[in-house]
Regions:
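Sec-dependent signal peptide hydrophobic core
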Residues: 5-9
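C-terminal motif of bacterial Sec signal peptides marking the signal peptidase cleavage site
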Residues: 13-16
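A sequence/structural signal for flexible, mid-protein segments enriched
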Residues: 18-293
């Protein structure tokens, strides 16, 4: 489980991006923050937390205390309905991360993600009910091939650029999100990880693929896009629905606008009724390339 990295980014950003802008910055009541995902062939994973006050000092203790426990979460694929069970794992930083997933004691009701399937989630927590829907679309847009080239205008000869050739099927409305994994690292999403097909509808095209970033660490803005000779690179390309696209498009815009006094306030577009966050389905394809030293 590597979702603790995404969880930290999500709960911090949702806590700040939803703050109302006014002159009297009072403390706000915590809201439920939901990060729920399901991928083809994988079990659902749901992380529940409480949002922070705008002026909170983020610490390991604050993060550890933000998880929401003992929620009743049910997930339906239209045929089966399963109730998820709460688990935890301990990160290398000794932080316990709590999440909900398949109940291993009731596998008869359990299911994993599948293409072309709609999912309905119901959350009951602290006397309130929250609902959301998502879908795993067909694996419509695919990566045909990967290769690498020397990083242009870079004096470091060990730096390379990943290049992908992809095909977009005819018809608007194909949305994607991508991640990269380098060697033993986890998958990280791109700085701008979501795209639509408004310009490239129905075409086969090539493009440079930026390296994914860990938003919980300082990012070298001049070099983060590059990979290195000797790297084993895995590209994860996922087809997503419109609501998942809208969430990450607005979330990433908000992330990149933090600290910019000239940017317009942006409301992150979630799809959880009554709460912050999102429930997203992913139709995933994986391709790996080894860059020689």
């Amino acid at each position: 489980m590597r979702q603790w990295l995404a969880f930290i980014s999500l709960v911090v950003l949702m806590s700040s991006c939803e703050k109302a802008i006014n002159f009297k910055l009072d403390s706000t009541q915590p809201s439920l923050v939901v990060e729920a995902t399901i991928e083809n062939g994988q079990p659902p994973v749901v992380i529940l937390s409480s949002s922070f006050d705008y002026f909170s000092n983020i610490s390991a203790e604050l993060l550890a205390g933000s998880f929401v426990h003992n929620a009743v979460i049910t997930l339906s694929n239209g045929v089966k309905t399963q109730q998820l069970k709460e688990y935890f794992y301990t990160t290398p930083a000794n932080l316990k991360v709590y999440y909900y997933s398949i109940d291993s004691s009731n596998l008869a009701a359990a299911f994993t993600g599948a293409f072309n399937t709609v999912y309905t989630m119901n959350i009951q927590s602290n006397g309130k009910t929250y609902t959301a829907n998502t879908s795993i679309p067909a694996l419509a847009k695919k990566v045909d091939s990967l290769w690498w080239k020397k990083a242009p205008y870079n004096p470091d000869s060990s730096k390379v650029v990943l290049v992908a050739k992809a095909t977009d099927p005819p018809g608007f409305g194909n949305y994607i999100r991508y991640f990269t994994k380098v060697n033993s690292e986890p998958f990280y999403p791109g700085m701008n990880s979501v795209f639509d097909d408004q310009i490239i509808d129905g075409t086969t095209y090539t493009l440079d693929v930026d390296r994914g970033v860990n938003r919980n660490e300082k990012i070298d803005m001049e070099n983060y896009v590059f990979f290195n000779k000797g790297d084993t690179i895995t590209l994860k390309l996922t087809n997503i629905d419109k609501s998942t696209f809208d969430f990450w498009r607005t979330m990433e815009y908000s992330y990149q606008s933090i600290g910019n006094p000239f940017s317009s306030p942006t409301r992150v577009t979630g799809n959880i009724n009554g709460a912050l966050g999102y429930f997203g389905g992913y139709a995933a394809q994986y391709k790996t390339i080894i860059v020689p030293k």
